[in-house]
């Protein structure tokens, strides 16, 4: 089915207000969920909203909590999220990293006691739109087996790197081949995964999203490389925030909350003039996209460039929502 942005935001707002969320908080949160969905990231927008409400109802998320700065060391700050709403807090933390970068050239905010930030790419994009390089990542509950194991002991720990090119170039990637959100998107659409995304119950690689969702044997991106990167990202976020590691979140909490996150902004224009920056970025992009194609009918893609078209299509033609997901939201 198709809905407008206003209809989608209104549905989110209604549910939030029914939980006695303050009007301004409900409006800002509904706006972020709707913008994420409008951008084409259904897995961490509309599809994730029922799960967000579940955690809100369970008390994992404290909607009136205010993040507090704990430590300030020039370009580096440490904050405690107080388990506030995840996407609103993350937006504030990247804004703070940008403020620090405007003073120091680089800004880093390490956040502890946070909630799921929904679409991590929103915060990298937020920095890149203002002309900054944006880098951020989060740890999570253990939802992926380390390489060589069957039991979940590491997080998917998504990493985002956004570059202020025209259009914005951005990598937004889980440390697994597919996020659990994308497994759900493909399952709801009745599709196999495009490449192997995990192991079946017999230990064989599989493209069946439902099987992986059930047994949790999701495949690390790049096999042992994604497993290793997940581990070091967790270590850095834990140390810089003085927060909880994947192990602590998994063993000590009843669900995924109290995670640790990193937000970095770099002001490129302190290091290079605008014309030179743009020319260098354009040369990189042209060099890549003019390579001989493996398939004449398939264009060479640059990461994140598809979001401009997805956003335009959704604004022109309406936002496609899975009927079952919409029904869940209406029932909340």
From Swiss-Prot:
Keywords: Cytoplasm, NAD, Oxidoreductase. NAD(+) binds at residues 168-174, 224-225, 304-306. It is found in: Cytoplasm. GO terms for cellular component: cytoplasm. It catalyses: 3-dehydro-L-gulonate + NAD(+) = 2,3-dioxo-L-gulonate + NADH + H(+); 3-dehydro-L-gulonate + NADP(+) = 2,3-dioxo-L-gulonate + NADPH + H(+). GO terms for molecular function: 3-dehydro-L-gulonate 2-dehydrogenase activity; NAD+ binding. Catalyzes the reduction of 2,3-diketo-L-gulonate in the presence of NADH, to form 3-keto-L-gulonate. Homodimer. Belongs to the LDH2/MDH2 oxidoreductase family. DlgD subfamily. This is 2,3-diketo-L-gulonate reductase. It comes from Salmonella paratyphi C (strain RKS4594).
